[in-house]
């Protein structure tokens, strides 16, 4: 009996080590492909039509697009409304869809809600594990926000998105 439990324990440890190796190995850059164009102000961005399983959670007023912040690294953006910009940054492990219920309660005729999805999550590019750092995420989000030519924003950050988002401003 104890021998069998020992084998089971050893097997679980080995599986855990294999899993840890698989999760932390380098990985490779995966760049998503969009289609079409989305006009934001006087700029044009690569459109990202939402798949049906995601589109059912938002209204047709939402704009879904990519901003390429470095070669091959794209940040997926969701945006809705017109008026004063509100920048909402989700944390781990979620995406811009986190804020959809909050957005439902906002006066979208007076606010423009901008919701990037962190690199590595959702529809944004996937990068090797070694590239996930506060400094890199700050830089990528800063580049995305700079493309939108925002003079000022109201900022909302949650979890990991708090430090990353505030660093991007």
Task: Describe the residue ranges of each PLM region.
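Gly/Ala-rich beta-loop-alpha elbow adjacent to hydrolase catalytic centers
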Residues: 157, 161, 165
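Conserved HGGG/HGGXW glycine-rich cap/lid loop of the alpha/beta-hydrolase fold
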Residues: 73, 78-123
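Hydrophobic alpha-helical transmembrane segments of multipass integral membrane proteins
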Residues: 6, 10-13, 89, 115, ...
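Alpha/beta-hydrolase fold catalytic core
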Residues: 2-84, 108-111
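Aromatic pocket-lining residues of Rossmann-like dinucleotide-binding sites
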Residues: 106, 168-169
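Active-site signature of alpha/beta-hydrolase-fold catalytic machinery across serine-
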Residues: 101, 167-168
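Active-site loop/oxyanion-hole signature of alpha/beta-hydrolase fold enzymes
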Residues: 57-58, 70-71, 115-157
């Amino acid at each position: 009996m104890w021998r069998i439990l020992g084998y089971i324990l050893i097997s679980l440890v080995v599986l855990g080590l294999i899993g840890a190796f698989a999760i932390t190995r380098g990985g490779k850059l995966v760049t998503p492909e969009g289609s079409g164009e989305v006009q934001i102000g006087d700029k044009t961005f690569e459109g990202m039509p939402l798949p049906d399983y995601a589109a059912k959670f938002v209204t047709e007023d939402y704009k879904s697009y990519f901003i390429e912040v470095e070669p091959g690294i794209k940040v997926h953006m969701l945006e809705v409304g017109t008026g004063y910009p509100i920048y909402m940054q989700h944390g781990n492990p979620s995406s811009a869809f986190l804020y959809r219920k909050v957005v439902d309660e906002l006066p979208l005729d007076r606010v423009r809600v901008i919701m990037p999805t962190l690199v590595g999550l959702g529809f944004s590019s996937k990068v090797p594990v070694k590239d996930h750092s506060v400094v890199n995420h700050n830089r990528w989000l800063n580049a995305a926000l700079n493309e939108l030519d925002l003079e000022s924003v109201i900022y909302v950050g949650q979890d990991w998105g708090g430090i990353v988002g505030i660093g991007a401003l």
